[in-house]
Amino acid sequence: MFSCVHWLQPFLVLLSSTLLIWGYNCPSSCLCPDHHTVDCTGQGLTRLPDSIPLDVRRLLLSNNWIPWVPSDFLVLYSDLVYLDLRNNSLTRLEPGTLSTSSRLVYLDLGSNNLTEIPSGTFEESRSLIKLRLGNNPFLSMVSKDAFLGLTSLRELELERNALSGLDVVVLSQLPSLRVIRLEGNPWVCNCNFAKLFLWLLENRHKLPMGLEGIECSLAVDGQRVSLSVLSEDSFRECRGMLTLTDYLIVIFSGICISVAAIIASFFLASMIHCFQRLKAKRTDEEEGEE
């Protein structure tokens, strides 16, 4: 019995060593300072590295040439809390890419070539605290529900992009927001910007550079001015203007009122007709009795 165990010892040691190597395998061209960190910063990668440990928590991929992230990339990395994809060549996020990133706390997508942030992009990233989307020179569109579900988000960076406008609903859906960066965008101070300006006015304490750090182009002459020189009165001509949604509500309300009026008129006419017939019948009965 003991001789068998003695004979198996070298095999067990070899097996254990192999499992340890597999468990903490580090991708080539990357560094792994600890068992839960993979650092592939500045390695000239044109795609995501292979053999990333399944229990990775910090994945550093900045300063490479990675053009896209497969939608199923994060499925196997359920422990990932920190993902840095800054300064790559990303042009868009595949639908569902972040659908399994429920533990992700930090995400950096800055300095890429993103053009838009579609609705529902981060809806499963409920643990996300810091989101960096700045320095995307072609990012001109952020959908109204792009950040829906980010109830824990405290810091949002959208500076130095190509945003000329932003629906204020985007920011109103972030109850935990403490810091928002919007400077360096080509904002246009028209009536579409009015609601966002009022939100920024009320939440100026969340702007690291204050209202002074954000500029917009005046709708009249295109002159760039700091938001700090504007006030609610700067948008007073917008107060009486209706949006497309307002017009649709007015039209729908008008149709409903018209239909209700027709039904009410028909009902009233029917009641009057019945009353007249009943009155005529009673008159005939009274004449017959006489």
Model-derived regions, located:
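Conserved hydrophobic beta-strand positions in leucine-rich repeat
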Residues: 38, 57-61, 80-85, 104-109, ...
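Ankyrin-repeat and related helical/solenoid repeat scaffolds used for protein-protein interactions
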Residues: 139-191
